[in-house]
């Protein structure tokens, strides 16, 4: 059985249980059991199957069983539990990294619970001794604490059903004043990964204990992990009512709810990272690379004199950037996105995850702290810059922890003479970021909490996207997420402002289906609002569902606001449905509100052309040209309408102006000008224009002949004999 087949059966089992289709779930389970070749599960499967058959028998033979619901619940959870076990057994055969790490841990901890407990106790004692040495300024220079922490991380992560000694370890770490906060963060991350690896209610409850503790830097990670778990296991939570009370208690705290909402929004934002990276690399970087020769010349970068100050800002930068249309706005937009928490550095740092530091899985989740011994060991003791860099990185709220380590480790291999410049630039950048923040924001403690959540989600994103063995993990950033369909959201988080925030997020990022769903949800929960009808209509329009969009625009129209915008959109939708009469009606309605809008007049004229009312279209375009005489976009339809209406001399004059203009001509400019010359019996000139038309396209004959056939009726109307058109085609083909 392939990896995909195992995953399909396992996921299908969970779906069947959620839908109440337990027989189908049992059949899936039987296939997994057969593949596992583990007979010790056979008895459990037979018991579940018999219990379910008996329950159905009693139910449909008329027996009243007050325990039916409880038995059904027990069978469902048992099916899922067995599916978890079989899935882990089968998956391990296909996952070499997890398999090797499990074997390594067994060699360290063994399998005897007493031995494992003893090793855990030893770890906790070492933490206390290490803290004591730090308090008395005694340094061992030993790597053992970090290695021990890596082992504890993997022990928690690879644990399936949590045991008493695991629970004791996690709680003692949470409560201990001797375990540093970065290591507590690692335990939280290991616990989160462990839940994704194997569902266990006790693990979820342990995460909530870290949240209740409210230790700065730690609880935000636990909260984020908990929310990702709730998203991932939403359909399964209903089978575990023991979670409801603890979660309700937890999210009664308004501050915590606000932080949870931020984490949800940041999670949605992180799913945009690939798009942001692609946009930056395709739209901004190429333009900046093209600018480099001009920057070097204009700023005389090769002539740095002794008197130059590296901190002086050169006004030429802004001038050069302005030379590239739209570049400054793009850079400004990406800077704003960065300040708002968007992940704009993924592409930059993705190639800097190859340091040995990132070999242990735990280090992908390690918070950046400037006292980390790993950092100091990477630099010579006499290096004057690294402490300034570490201090700056620790304060840099806009860079995630994983990227901070990449930055610092890469800095260590940069030539010493360049380090000063980089540190100075980095400190200036950090200072500028602080300047963007208001005084109130700097004093707002919630911002610190927010930055922890944002950075942690970006750390998680890097792990799931860049870790060498990432394919052995379920990527929590993949798959469809619709809060409207999630029971945990309805139970613990549902409130109108957040629904609106999620809807706006999807709308702004052009996720039309999700936006439509969330605005529909908002509509169900609130009073009728014109802006909701408008946004739903616009989403439907962008999805190509024009008739539905019209229905919603008409409902928005009843509120008597934004009439110009609504009429314009209705006209556009009717155009797409090719109902040009209705389109004209709405565009004219909009024109009454904004009579001087040339765009509206152009749309009305376009509808007249589509309705073959060329005289009406020509009148409008002629009026528009009076105000914009040099606009070829207006002259083109004027020339074509004149040709169709038989005003050949005027059409010839118009096409002569179009072809003389330095603006790039289209295939149709040459073709239509050729039509006019042909009808005026200027055949040689006409064929030259037709040749230029053919030369302007990649695959010449099909689109050219198709357009020629469409226009043949106007050629016939203007005196060309029907037999002449096929001769014209053959003549042109001989020319190439």
Per-region residue spans from a language model:
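TPR-adjacent "capping" and linker segments in tetratricopeptide-repeat scaffold/adaptor proteins
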Residues: 1-8, 15-16, 100-120, 136-143, ...
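Alpha-solenoid helical-repeat scaffolds
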Residues: 369-560
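TPR alpha-solenoid repeat register
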Residues: 498, 531-532, 566, 600, ...
């Amino acid at each position: 059985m392939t990896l995909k087949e195992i995953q399909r059966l396992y996921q299908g089992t969970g779906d069947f249980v959620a839908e109440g289709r337990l027989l189908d779930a049992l059949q899936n389970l039987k296939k997994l059991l057969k593949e596992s070749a583990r007979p010790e599960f056979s008895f459990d499967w037979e018991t579940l199957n018999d219990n379910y058959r008996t329950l159905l028998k009693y139910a449909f033979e008329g027996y009243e069983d007050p325990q039916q619901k409880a038995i059904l619940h027990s069978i469902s959870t048992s099916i899922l539990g067995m599916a978890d076990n079989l899935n882990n057994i089968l998956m391990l055969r296909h996952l070499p990294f997890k398999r090797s790490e499990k074997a390594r841990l067994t060699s360290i901890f063994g399998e005897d619970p007493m031995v494992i407990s003893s090793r855990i106790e030893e770890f906790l004692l070492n933490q206390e001794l290490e803290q004591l040495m730090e308090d008395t300024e005694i340094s061992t220079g030993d790597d053992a604490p970090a290695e021990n922490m890596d082992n504890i991380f993997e022990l928690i992560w690879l644990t399936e059903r949590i045991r008493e000694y695991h629970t004791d370890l996690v709680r003692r770490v949470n409560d201990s004043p001797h375990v540093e906060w970065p290591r507590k963060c690692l335990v939280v991350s290991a616990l989160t990964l462990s839940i994704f690896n194997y569902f266990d209610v006790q693990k979820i409850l342990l995460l909530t204990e870290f949240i209740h503790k409210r230790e700065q830097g730690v609880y935000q990670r636990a909260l984020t992990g908990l929310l990702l778990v709730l998203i991932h296991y939403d359909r399964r939570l209903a089978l575990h009512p023991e979670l409801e009370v603890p979660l309700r208690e937890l999210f009664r705290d308004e501050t915590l709810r606000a932080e949870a909402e931020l984490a949800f929004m940041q999670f949605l934002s992180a799913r945009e990272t690939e798009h942001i990276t692609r946009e930056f690399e395709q739209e901004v970087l190429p333009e900046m690379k093209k600018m480099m020769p001009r920057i070097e010349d204009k700023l005389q970068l090769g002539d740095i004199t002794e008197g130059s100050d590296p901190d002086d800002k050169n006004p030429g930068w802004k001038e050069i950037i302005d030379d590239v249309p739209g570049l400054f706005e793009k850079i400004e937009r990406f800077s704003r996105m960065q300040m708002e928490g968007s992940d704009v550095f993924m592409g930059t740092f993705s190639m800097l995850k190859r340091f040995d530091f990132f070999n242990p899985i735990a280090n992908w989740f390690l918070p950046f702290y400037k006292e980390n011994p790993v950092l100091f060991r990477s630099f010579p003791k006499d290096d004057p810059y690294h402490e300034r860099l570490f201090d700056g990185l620790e304060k840099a709220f806009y860079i995630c922890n994983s990227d901070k380590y990449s930055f610092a480790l890469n800095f260590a291999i940069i030539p010493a003479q360049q380090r000063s410049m980089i540190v100075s630039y980095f400190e200036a950048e950090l200072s500028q970021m602080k300047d963007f923040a208001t005084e109130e924001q700097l004093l707002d403690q919630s911002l610190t909490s927010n930055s922890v959540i944002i950075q942690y989600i970006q750390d998680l994103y890097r792990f799931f996207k860049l870790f060498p063995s990432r394919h052995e993990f379920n990527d929590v950033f993949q798959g469809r997420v619709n809060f409207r369909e999630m029971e945990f959201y309805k139970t613990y988080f549902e409130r109108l402002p957040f629904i609106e925030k999620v809807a706006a997020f999807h709308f702004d990022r052009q996720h039309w289906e999700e936006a439509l769903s969330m605005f529909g949800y908002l509509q169900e929960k609130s009073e009728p609002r014109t802006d909701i009808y408008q946004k739903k209509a616009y989403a439907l329009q962008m999805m190509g569902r024009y008739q539905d969009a019209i229905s919603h625009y008409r409902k928005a129209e009843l509120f008597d606001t934004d009439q110009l915008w609504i009429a314009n959109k209705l006209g556009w939708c009717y155009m797409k449905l090719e109902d040009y009469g209705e389109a004209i009606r709405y565009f004219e309605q909009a024109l009454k509100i904004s009579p001087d809008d040339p765009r509206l007049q152009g749309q009305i004229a376009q509808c007249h052309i589509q309705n073959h009312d060329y005289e009406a279209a020509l009148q409008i375009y002629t009026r528009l040209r009076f105000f914009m005489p040099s606009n070829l976009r207006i002259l083109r339809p004027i020339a074509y309408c004149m040709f169709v209406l038989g005003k050949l001399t005027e059409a010839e004059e118009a096409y002569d102006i179009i072809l003389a203009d330095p603006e790039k001509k289209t295939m149709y400019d040459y073709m239509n000008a050729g039509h006019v010359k042909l009808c005026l019996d200027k055949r040689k000139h006409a064929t030259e224009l037709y040749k230029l038309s053919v030369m302007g396209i990649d695959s010449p004959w099909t689109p050219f002949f198709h357009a020629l056939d469409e226009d043949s009726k106007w050629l016939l109307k203007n005196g060309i004999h029907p037999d002449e058109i096929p001769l014209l085609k053959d003549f042109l083909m001989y020319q190439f």
